[in-house]
């Protein structure tokens, strides 16, 4: 069958586990400090939502009302080594006086946690392979128990390396928001030139990805040219401009957009009721930076 599938993608391998402290900045946006990279991540498994969803019937409708509890993701992280960043910055363990050991305190730390999963896709248009990453962020992640492990005595078959399993939970954040909404987790996908820029930024200084993080090489909307117009009748506020509902992006794709018209004072205006003056039209689409176009309306002669 000749069907129009999306680009083929696969993801494999974990790397670059970063933990950081998060607080609300002066402008209300997250601020991150004390970034540390944690070595030895093997896997992150079964981050399942433990919140119950209940339906309440009424009349002949089985789901007259639906209630869901607060989102609580629970799962585990597996490590092949436990370094200082894991012991002190996540598990809150106390280092011994001689600096050689750590002891549990039960004072587990809540951290913003980010890790990467390698990815590769085959572009549906060019057929070329493109490398990238899936960036997973848990804004509020806390251990729920000390790390567990198993060891075995050497044998003729050899032994497997010890792995430490850490039970964790992730909850919604009041600071790390997506579109004004609290989220317990976000997964980003970055490819090609954006992935290269992400690596460059990460190598120059550890950082946590945010919904408004801008990376070089992003596909952007192309702002349209809107023709200037005159009002329909002299002396009346009845100007109408041509506002497209789709735009081209920088790779030639067609994108459905929404738009808002504002006058020179920033007040929202209604198309078809425009007074003589200058207006700015802002175009928006999910996954793209907003673009604007200017247009003027003159009085009918």
UniProtKB/Swiss-Prot annotation:
Q: Which UniProt keywords apply?
A: Capsid protein, Viral genome ejection through host cell envelope, Viral long flexible tail ejection system, Viral penetration into host cytoplasm, Viral tail protein, Viral tail tube protein, Virion, Virus entry into host cell
Q: What are the subcellular locations of this protein?
A: Virion
* Alphabetical list of InterPro entries matching this protein: L_lac_phage_MSP, L_lac_phage_MSP_N, Phage_tube_C
Keyword set includes Nucleotide-binding: no
Record-level GO BP terms:
symbiont genome ejection through host cell envelope, long flexible tail mechanism
Name one matching Pfam family.
Phage_tube_C
Q: What's any one GO cellular component for it?
A: virus tail, tube
Classify the source by domain of life. Answer: Viruses
Give the primary localization class. virion
Q: State the oligomer form and interacting partners.
A: Homohexamer. The tube is composed of 31 hexameric rings.
What is known about what this protein does? Answer: Forms the cylindrical rigid tail tube.
In the record, the note on similarity to other proteins reads:
Belongs to the skunalikevirus tail tube protein family.
Q: What is this protein called?
A: Tail tube protein
Name its species: Lactococcus phage F4-1
């Amino acid at each position: 069958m000749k069907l129009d599938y999306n680009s083929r993608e696969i993801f494999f391998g974990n790397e670059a586990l970063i933990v950081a402290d998060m607080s609300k900045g002066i402008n209300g946006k997250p601020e991150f400090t004390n970034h540390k990279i944690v070595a030895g991540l093997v896997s992150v498994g079964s981050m399942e939502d433990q919140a119950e969803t209940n339906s309440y019937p009424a009349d002949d409708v089985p789901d007259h009302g639906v209630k869901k509890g607060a989102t609580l993701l629970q799962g585990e992280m597996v490590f092949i080594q436990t370094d200082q960043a894991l012991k002190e910055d996540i598990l809150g363990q106390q280092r011994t006086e001689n600096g050689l050991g750590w002891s549990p305190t039960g004072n587990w730390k809540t951290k913003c946690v980010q890790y990467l999963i390698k990815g590769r896709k085959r572009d549906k248009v060019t057929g070329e392979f493109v490398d990238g990453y899936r960036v997973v962020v848990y804004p509020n992640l806390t251990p729920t128990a000390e790390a567990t492990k198993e060891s075995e005595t050497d044998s003729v078959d050899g032994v497997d390396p010890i792995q430490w399993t850490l039970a964790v939970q992730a909850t919604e954040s009041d600071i790390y928001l997506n579109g004004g909404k609290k989220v317990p987790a976000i997964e980003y996908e970055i490819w090609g030139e954006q992935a290269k820029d992400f690596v460059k930024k990460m190598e120059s200084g550890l950082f946590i990805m945010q919904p408004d993080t801008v990376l070089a090489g992003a596909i952007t909307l192309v702002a349209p040219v809107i023709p200037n117009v005159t009002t329909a009748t002299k002396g009346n506020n009845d100007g109408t401009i041509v506002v497209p509902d789709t735009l081209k992006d920088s790779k030639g794709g067609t994108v459905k957009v929404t738009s808002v018209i504002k006058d020179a004072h920033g007040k929202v205006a209604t198309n078809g009721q425009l007074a003589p003056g200058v207006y700015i039209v802002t175009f928006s689409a999910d996954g793209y930076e907003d673009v604007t176009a200017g247009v003027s309306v003159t009085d009918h002669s």
